[in-house]
Amino acid sequence: MSQAYSSSQRVSSYRRTFGGAPSFPLGSPLSSPVFPRAGFGTKGSSSSVTSRVYQVSRTSGGAGGLGALRASRLGSTRVPSSYGAGELLDFSLADAVNQEFLTTRTNEKVELQELNDRFANYIEKVRFLEQQNAALAAEVNRLKGREPTRVAEIYEEELRELRRQVEVLTNQRARVDVERDNLLDDLQRLKAKLQEEIQLKEEAENNLAAFRADVDAATLARIDLERRIESLNEEIAFLKKVHEEEIRELQAQLQEQQVQVEMDMSKPDLTAALRDIRAQYETIAAKNISEAEEWYKSKVSDLTQAANKNNDALRQAKQEMMEYRHQIQSYTCEIDALKGTNDSLMRQMRELEDRFASEASGYQDNIARLEEEIRHLKDEMARHLREYQDLLNVKMALDVEIATYRKLLEGEESRINLPIQTFSALNFRETSPEQRGSEVHTKKTVMIKTIETRDGEVVSEATQQQHEVL
């Protein structure tokens, strides 16, 4: 009996749970529970099925477990073969057996008290673990029900805000690109207009150079004509002098002829001849003078007209040149203003691009940070779920241990409450090992609990018990 209780004492829930299950010999009253654990589904699997099998073995007697156990325990006392079944023992042997039985009962009471104390401590620890398990289950449920939803809502809200800002920035960038394209078109058009104005300026400069050549030629012609006029005036003056000298000479000759005529009154035809000659010379001189004056006047009028025409052309060329200069200056100012505007717009566009790039990088960093936080929260949830599953496994093992201890206590209480028979009326019989083996049998209860999980959540549970008699 003490050996049976010592073996049952070795079957401790604390040792089985935390110190490993001891090995029991064949035929012990209690075999350790078997907890085969199926591995959890790895990350990414849609569902997993976890099965746990609990094996509880209980030894019961054929006619009565206690009687068989007591008979097998007391059967070790060698009884002489001369005594038959049903014969009484002598009182000395009965006293010895009674004393041994009382000692065994006292030891059993002490051991049972120790086991009760240990069992009370074990119950307290189980209650504490159940409280922790309930707190962790509540925490897991809270995390399942609230925290992921709130984080998802915050993430979705920030993601929508970031998408809206990205759309606004994209629209602004598209608008800036359109404005830039329009400005580039205006710049190209102004460049084409500038090229046309430059070509017109070059043509005006070429015309001005041609006009300058014409003016120079007209100036040279005018100077030449002025020199010719001077030479003609000098020639006219010289001819006048020559004519006057000829006239004086002719007058002197006429006077001499008149003197001779007066001296020679006998020659009246000479005076008439001189008069005719003088008239002829005067006619010729007047004709030459009139022709020279007409030629001079015609030349002067031609030169004056040419000079006036050249002066008009020069004045018109100067006016056109001034207009072209004013246009070039206005176009140059306009081009400078457009260049400044283009530079400012390009600078603004670069600043906007840099700002958009920095904001986009900031948004990307925020998105990466939020994704990292979500991943961290998911890892925390998975860790809490694993801890919860482990605690659930421990709880189920403890439940099985408690049930086992309850069965043991019920068996001990039923054994203690049995009436103690008078040893004088006890009939002892010797049983052989073959008979004890036929009387003792083992009843094994197999509990199969199937838990189906999907993505870390318990979907369904199923419990099945199988009883086998060994």
Swiss-Prot record:
Region (Coil 1B): 152-252
IF rod domain: residues covered: 108-416
GO biological process, one term: nuclear envelope organization
Region feature (Linker 1): 142-151
Coil 2A: annotated span: 269-287
Mod. after translation: ADP-ribosylation prevents ability to form intermediate filaments.
Residue numbers of Phosphothreonine PTMs: 17, 77
Protein known as: Desmin
Species of origin: Bos taurus (Bovine)
Lineage of source species: Eukaryota, Metazoa, Chordata, Craniata, Vertebrata
